[in-house]
Amino acid sequence: MLNSYDLIRRPVITEKSMAAMADRQYTFIVDIRADKTQIKKAVEKVFGVKVEEVRTARFDGKVKRVGVHVGKRSDYKKAMVKLTEDSKTIEFFEGM
């Protein structure tokens, strides 16, 4: 089983994800092997908040070319986490 701190890779900082923060919804890139219950427990443990809902999406890495060499970016999983109304906000995103 993955450690809670290893499961959450990084936050997604885009215009769309920042607009969703007004609705108490935060977006993270997570380990591709993680399921929704593991993601919920990890976010609650790491940030000390209450999670209401977790939605996930899995993406295939793009094929990229540099000259004659062809490579592929890594596959990744994105998790959209919605917090409960009585939960505090995640301090990491404050001031962005």
Curated annotation (Swiss-Prot):
It comes from the Bacteria. It holds the Pfam family Ribosomal_L23. SUPFAM superfamilies: Ribosomal proteins S24e, L23 and L15e. The keyword Ribonucleoprotein applies. InterPro entries: Nucleotide-bd_a/b_plait_sf (IPR012677), Ribosomal_uL23-like (IPR013025), Ribosomal_uL23/eL15/eS24_sf (IPR012678). GO terms for molecular function: rRNA binding; structural constituent of ribosome. Keywords: Ribonucleoprotein, Ribosomal protein, RNA-binding, rRNA-binding. GO terms for cellular component: ribonucleoprotein complex; ribosome. One of its GO terms (biological process) is translation. Part of the 50S ribosomal subunit. Contacts protein L29, and trigger factor when it is bound to the ribosome. Belongs to the universal ribosomal protein uL23 family. One of the early assembly proteins it binds 23S rRNA. One of the proteins that surrounds the polypeptide exit tunnel on the outside of the ribosome. Forms the main docking site for trigger factor binding to the ribosome. This is Large ribosomal subunit protein uL23. The gene is rplW.
